[in-house]
């Protein structure tokens, strides 16, 4: 399996090698009458600096997550609004006691040399949807979102995003904002990295990656991928397979790598390298 994208110093200082965390498996006896429907869980760790949200097996999540600084700016409050019941653990509460599909959890900031995940979301084996908004205007403590198997959709927003989103297996659609990282995983994924200064990797499968403002690092990995740079100085990697790369405007670097690739530089002073294979290389 291909390597996932990594953060770079100073903003992306922490190298991420994130695996999908084990999902909670509820204990139930087949055929037991009146068995309780398993719920998602939200709980801050005992050191108060990281919130973990876990879906139950078999759930379809449609979650909206908002991150905002506490009044004294010493921590972050995450409000998670889903369509499934959530069990509120340590440092989490229901804003409306009658609605157990929405929780608010507060984590305390820590003094760390490197960026760290203040929120870890592990969704499960269905077609899930997550909308994440970072309203903290910082990305040192970021969100790490694993969508799990299934055809999932994630959308990140905010002046600064900074989230790390992993699609895992399935045909996923990932949209990340400024400073966001994305990894499609196995499947035919679509990754929109238009916020600026993004790192995105498609993973195994025939993927489509699109850049936007500022510089992007976009890699297709295994499969026949199509990659579009944006308006900045982008670096595009095709990976294994017959790939098509479009630099568009800006001084771009395009690397087809192995396979019969097509590289189109677009306006700007571009560097084009087809790699092994029967390649088509065109510079405007």
What are these regions (language model features)?
Residues 1-35:
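Secretory targeting and sorting signals
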Residues 73-119, 216, 261, 267-284:
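Acidic, glycine-rich low-complexity repeat segments characteristic
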Residues 93-156, 174:
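Right-handed parallel beta-helix
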Residues 123, 132, 147, 156, ...:
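Glycine-centered beta-turn/loop sites at beta-strand termini
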């Amino acid at each position: 399996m291909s390597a996932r994208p990594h953060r770079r110093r100073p903003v992306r200082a922490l190298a991420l090698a994130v695996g999908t965390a084990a999902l909670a498996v509820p204990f139930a006896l087949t055929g037991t009458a009146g068995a309780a429907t398993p719920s998602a869980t939200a709980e801050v760790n005992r050191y108060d600096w990281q919130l973990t949200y876990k879906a139950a097996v078999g759930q379809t999540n449609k979650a909206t997550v908002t991150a905002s600084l506490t009044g004294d700016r010493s921590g972050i409050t995450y409000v998670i609004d889903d369509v499934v019941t959530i069990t509120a653990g340590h440092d989490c509460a229901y804003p409306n006691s009658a609605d157990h599909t929405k929780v608010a959890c507060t984590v305390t900031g820590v003094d760390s040399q490197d960026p760290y995940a203040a929120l870890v979301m592990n969704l499960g084996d269905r077609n899930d949807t997550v909308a994440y908004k970072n309203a903290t205007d910082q990305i040192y403590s970021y969100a790490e979102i694993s969508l799990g198997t299934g055809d999932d959709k994630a959308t990140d927003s905010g002046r600064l995003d900074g989230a790390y989103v992993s699609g895992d297996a399935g045909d996923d659609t990932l949209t990340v904002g400024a400073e966001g990282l994305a990894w499609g995983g196995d499947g035919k994924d679509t990754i929109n990295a238009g916020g600026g200064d993004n790192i995105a990797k498609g993973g195994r499968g025939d993927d489509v990656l699109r850049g936007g403002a500022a510089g992007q690092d976009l890699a297709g990995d295994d499969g026949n991928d199509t990659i579009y740079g944006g308006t900045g100085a982008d670096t595009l990697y095709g990976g294994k397979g017959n790939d098509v790369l479009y630099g568009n405007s800006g001084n771009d670097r395009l690397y087809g790598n192995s396979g019969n690739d097509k590289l189109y530089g677009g306006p700007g002073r571009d560097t084009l390298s087809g790699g092994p294979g029967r390649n088509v290389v065109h510079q405007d």
